[in-house]
Amino acid sequence: MTDLLIIGGGAACTRGLTTAVVEHNPKGPGQKLLITGKGRCNVTNDCDVREFLNYVRHNPRFLYSALYAFSPASAMELFESLGVPLKTERGRRVFPQSDRAADVLAALRSYAADAKFVHGSAKELLIEDGRCVGVRTSDGKTHRAAHVLVTTGGTSYPATGSDGSGYKLARQ
């Protein structure tokens, strides 16, 4: 059984777990990443967690524990270790030195090379004894895991896969 099942190919770290990713965009994960920062990918901001949280408009407390576990500095260290040299610009925004979001995506795909990718849409969460144990995909197959993480994004850009489909799953 997989340790972690990630629904949506967003930027999620595996932390050494056996991981499977269910991604419904036929072009693969990370399509929205390619257009962030006008195609340059604003990776993070070069500041501490408290300052970072000051820029979060809605419910910054929701991100508190996640950002203290994986801070902006940690993100910068990760990308540098993956061979993506970074630069800091006005407003402390951090970009790849190449100014190419594709370099960031390539590094993340390389980092996730050991993950199993399942192409298809997550249609229904599998709930047993009040706990999510997997997902049923559009082809009718079930995928089980010890933990399930929904990272489908919002509704900002449906052409990239950010169509809000994860909201329905999360309500289950």
Question: How should each PLM-predicted stretch be described?
Answer:
Residues L63-A73, R90-S110, Y157-S162:
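Short beta-strand to alpha-helix junction loop
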